């Protein structure tokens, strides 16, 4: 699901083509969240777990206007707690950083379900680049099917 921006092509302009100013943006993954923040962009929701490719990663501190929230999520799964936390976070008007105890990889799925139409979810594809998912009813339907298969 989504559009791949190759690693060699990831820059602020490429990201802005996918998520122009005013777009609700969600980032999933430590490196993706740091890259987007490094371009001077503040996602509505950053989902991180303090790991990159399963190795410990010390995330950069969030900007002062970004509130930290937390949830626990098992590796290879999606916890009801994280689903509810993401649902509530995407109803917020203030930027949030969700720090996951466990693994955040599959949390792109509930982000796609609860983000509004027109939102963009970005996550990293290791060794390939950055994936941008443009949320609409079709993406939401696919994400719900994936959630059912994981649950």
Curated annotation (Swiss-Prot):
Q: Which InterPro entries match?
A: GTP-dep_dephospho-CoA_kin (IPR007164)
- Biological role stated in the UniProt entry: Catalyzes the GTP-dependent phosphorylation of the 3'-hydroxyl group of dephosphocoenzyme A to form coenzyme A (CoA).
Pfam families attached here? DUF359
Chain positions recorded as GTP binding sites: 30-31, 49, 51, 104
Its Enzyme Commission number(s) read 2.7.1.237
- Pathway participation: Cofactor biosynthesis; coenzyme A biosynthesis
Q: Name one GO biological process term.
A: coenzyme A biosynthetic process
Q: Which GO terms describe its molecular function?
A: GTP binding; kinase activity
The reaction(s) annotated as catalysed by this protein in its Swiss-Prot or TrEMBL entry are: 3'-dephospho-CoA + GTP = GDP + CoA + H(+)
Please report the name of this protein according to its UniProt entry.
GTP-dependent dephospho-CoA kinase
Its keywords, alphabetically, are: Coenzyme A biosynthesis, GTP-binding, Kinase, Nucleotide-binding, Transferase
Taxonomic classification, please?
Answer: Archaea, Nitrososphaerota, Candidatus Cenarchaeales, Candidatus Cenarchaeaceae, Candidatus Cenarchaeum
Family, according to the entry, reads as follows: Belongs to the GTP-dependent DPCK family.
Keyword Magnesium found: no
């Amino acid at each position: 699901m989504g559009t791949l921006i190759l690693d060699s092509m990831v820059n602020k302009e490429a990201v802005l083509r996918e998520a122009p100013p005013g777009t609700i943006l969600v980032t999933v993954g430590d490196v993706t969240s740091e890259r987007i923040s490094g371009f001077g962009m503040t996602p509505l929701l950053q989902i991180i777990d303090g790991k990159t490719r399963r190795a410990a990663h010390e995330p950069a501190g969030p900007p002062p206007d970004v509130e930290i929230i937390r949830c626990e999520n098992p590796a290879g799964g999606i916890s009801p707690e994280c689903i509810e936390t993401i649902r509530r976070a995407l109803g917020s008007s203030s930027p949030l950083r969700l720090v996951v105890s466990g693994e955040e990889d599959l949390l792109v799925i509930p982000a796609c379900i609860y983000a509004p139409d027109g939102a963009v979810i970005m996550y990293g594809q290791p060794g390939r680049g950055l994936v941008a998912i443009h949320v609409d009813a079709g993406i939401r339907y696919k994400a719900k099917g994936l959630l059912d298969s994981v649950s």
